[in-house]
Amino acid sequence: MAGEIHRITKETLEKLKAEWTELTTVGRTENARVIEAARLLGDLSENGDYHAAKDHQGKMEARIRQIDHVIRNHELVERDGNAGTVQYASIVQIVYEDDADDDFQEFFIGSIEEKPDEVLVASPTSPLGSALLEKAIGELVEYEAPSGILRVKIVGIR
């Protein structure tokens, strides 16, 4: 993670700041309360509630560190006004060579922090993401995957 720059939109930055604030205030306070209540139940070595609360605390602290890293190491980007081509933050519908157009997969071109729930993510620096940038609907795109050269057709952009 060191030195990594996260390209995100202003909206995502604001969302991350709000999540960080929520986790570092309400989240930590509530988790401390749950840990203390579980501690009062007795022997900690066999206390499932206590161990679950401590596990949750670890995951929450990891998320806080992750958000903090993104906030400290971000570059704001704006989506280009050219809706006819794939841009940062576009959702692209692609089909692999020889597949039917209605058998598409959707990829969000951007950061995992911005990912809409219903789609996969392709980083703009990944082989697929970089190959799709600036391309238009109907174009055939080649990119190198671990299994070799793959060809996809862009069937939709939103």
Model-derived regions: residue spans:
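Residue-level signal for pocket-adjacent positions within structured domains
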Residues: G3, R39, S45, I71-R72, ...
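Short amphipathic alpha-helical segments, especially helix-boundary/capping motifs
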Residues: I8-L13, Q66-I67, Q105-E106
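Generic structural "secondary-structure junction" signal
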Residues: K10, T25, D43-E46, N73, ...
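General N-terminal targeting signals
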Residues: A18, T25, E30, L40, ...
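Internal alpha/beta loop-helix hairpins
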Residues: G48-D80, G84
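Non-DNA-binding regulatory cores of transcription-related proteins
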Residues: V77-K153, R158
